[in-house]
Amino acid sequence: MSILNHFFDYKPEVLALDEKAMELCQPYFRHMEEIRDFNQLKMLKAFADTQMSSTDMLGTTGYGLWDTGRAKLEQIFAEVMGAEDALVRSQFQSGTHTLAVALFGLLRAGDTLLAATGRPYDTLEGVIGLDGKGKGTGTLMDYGVQYDEAPLKADFTPDYDLIAKKAPGAKVCHIQRSRGYLQRNAFDLETIRKIADTARAANPDIIIFVDNCYGELTQTQEPCQVGADIAVGSLIKNPGGGIAPTGGYIVGRKDLVELCAYRLNAPGLGKELGCTLETPRDMYLGFYYAPGVVCEAIKTAIYAQCMLELLGKNPVPRYCDDHNDIVTCFDAGTADALIGFCQGIQAASPVDSYAAPEPSPEPGYTDEVVMASGSFTQGSTIELSCDGPLREPYTCYLQGGLNFAASRAGVLLAIQKAYFKD
């Protein structure tokens, strides 16, 4: 009997698929483990270089002045991310909030934001003010910032000619590394480099801005090492390692990070303020563990992609592709299959496993959405979770997985509930 059936009741045909998928995935697992090992040693070196000590994890209150633990954590982030400086704070509430702080920090009235990888995902539309969203609430457009975009081509690749044409009039060139709700692969670092080179050749002063959410530590380099001036992400995604309870980061050129700090705090205060309370230990530990956790999440993605491909689905990316974020998307085919898949993920979660996700209206979505997230941290996407809108072709987005053993069980249960019903 498979060890899996000691704890969950899987059908023989599901276990047969599992056996085949595990065999096919081994070389791709080993590749990710090599990336993990490189990044873990890079992480260890950064911790040692800062001479981080146990007292740095104690936290501060009030203003947070002279917080050496906060300063050392930011130094570690900067070194690991290949940047001059970093702003790593628990005061960032989400990835969207962190992105908003960075954009407002860099852009002024009359400046133009160029979205070089097409329209950003939904939550940023309200920050920018696209299509009148959030009008009068303090969007970038409310403050006189202009918006332009270079849509992706039909094959979801950047339109470099259009980027070169539009870059001279822009202050910031925005690159979204992950797919959002498009069925495309995440952009690899060479693509980010080429976008940066193209925009900078047309406008040497343009600021290359990368939304790095879901992409951290998936490769051995980061965007600031391939031409980005600033990169932004969330600590309840990859770099928090499933341990950081909240927060975000901004890394990049020192002068630009300082501008972002003025926006987060106040002009004249910059990085000097911001108490850490009881968060430093979790933020240090989460970042230290992040290379291993990201590896487990991508192994989960590779395995899920292989299983889905064996079932005749067409996941993006494929299990044999290079992986530049932790997200998998595929067309479930029917509403029942999408709901069943989400219910299987939830049933094999450590938190709220007894819940059965059902479609419901969600703010910002035109269709009902079904979501599964049995996570320790609310909204965490480095923990195994999935979601999808109830509209054809019933696309499901799967991400995360703190450890492969448990995530494998979840994927199997999801596939069984979706495609092997009695």
Residue ranges and their predicted role:
Residues I3-Q26, E33, K42-D56, L65, ...:
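Conserved PLP-enzyme active-site core in the AAT-like
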Residues Y63-G69:
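N-terminal small-domain helix-loop-helix segment of the aminotransferase-like
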Residues E309-D422:
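Conserved C-terminal alpha-helix-loop-beta "cap" of PLP-dependent enzymes
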Residues T60-T61, L87-S90, I326-D331:
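Short glycine-rich or small-residue beta-strand-to-loop segments that form or flank ligand, phosphate
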Residues A71, F77-G82, S90-Q91:
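Extended, compositionally biased flexible segments
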